[in-house]
């Protein structure tokens, strides 16, 4: 590969990594073409981009990313890079689910908002709520609070009427 092409790839990967909320490194050695296509489709469904780029080029691109120096430690053997732009957790869920069915996919490391996670931390990452799940939970809490406001107001009004009624009886 010529130097110009390498520089272009580094520039493109750097731009993608700088925009990313979550960066995941995987080892895909032993996955056949059909399994790789299936993995890419799973990532695509949740809005994650999966790329295979030479380790030396990814290492160069990671120089400008928070946590990139630590993440570069995971650049060995064959490396696939999963880049999550909207939700940093969904990629972990895909990797965990896919690696249970395909032992040839191995999680190496991840960086989420500058924090680096080791391979042993994949189950914890995958068990975290995704952005959509968190929004749903907050919406449910807000909905419950809004629904309870009329009941609280009615209870206060009922108690006020009761107190006023008792005060009126005492004055008589």
Swiss-Prot record:
Keywords: Ribonucleoprotein, Ribosomal protein, RNA-binding, rRNA-binding. CDD domains: Ribosomal_L10 (cd05797). One of its GO terms (biological process) is translation. One of its GO terms (molecular function) is large ribosomal subunit rRNA binding. Pfam families: Ribosomal_L10. One of its GO terms (cellular component) is large ribosomal subunit. InterPro entries: Ribosomal_uL10, Ribosomal_uL10-like_sf, Ribosomal_uL10_bac, Ribosomal_uL10_bac_type, Ribosomal_uL10_CS_bac. PANTHER family: 39S RIBOSOMAL PROTEIN L10, MITOCHONDRIAL (PTHR11560). Part of the ribosomal stalk of the 50S ribosomal subunit. The N-terminus interacts with L11 and the large rRNA to form the base of the stalk. The C-terminus forms an elongated spine to which L12 dimers bind in a sequential fashion forming a multimeric L10(L12)X complex. Belongs to the universal ribosomal protein uL10 family. Forms part of the ribosomal stalk, playing a central role in the interaction of the ribosome with GTP-bound translation factors. This is Large ribosomal subunit protein uL10. It comes from Prosthecochloris aestuarii (strain DSM 271 / SK 413).
């Amino acid at each position: 590969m010529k130097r110009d092409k390498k520089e272009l790839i580094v520039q493109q990967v750097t731009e993608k990594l700088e925009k990313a909320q979550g960066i995941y490194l995987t080892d895909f050695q032993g996955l056949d073409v059909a399994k790789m296509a299936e993995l890419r489709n799973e990532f695509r469904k949740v809005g994650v981009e999966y790329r295979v780029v030479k380790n030396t080029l990814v290492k160069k691109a990671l120089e400008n990313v928070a946590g990139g120096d630590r993440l570069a430690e995971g650049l060995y053997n064959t490396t696939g890079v999963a880049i999550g732009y909207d939700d940093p957790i969904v990629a972990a869920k895909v990797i965990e689910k896919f690696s249970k069915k395909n032992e040839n996919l191995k999680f190496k490391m991840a960086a989420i908002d500058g924090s680096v996670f080791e391979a042993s931390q994949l189950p914890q990452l995958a068990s975290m709520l995704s952005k959509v799940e968190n929004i749903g939970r907050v919406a449910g809490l807000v909905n419950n609070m809004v629904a309870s406001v009329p009941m609280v107001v009615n209870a206060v009004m009922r108690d006020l009427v009761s107190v006023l009624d008792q005060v009126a009886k005492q004055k008589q």
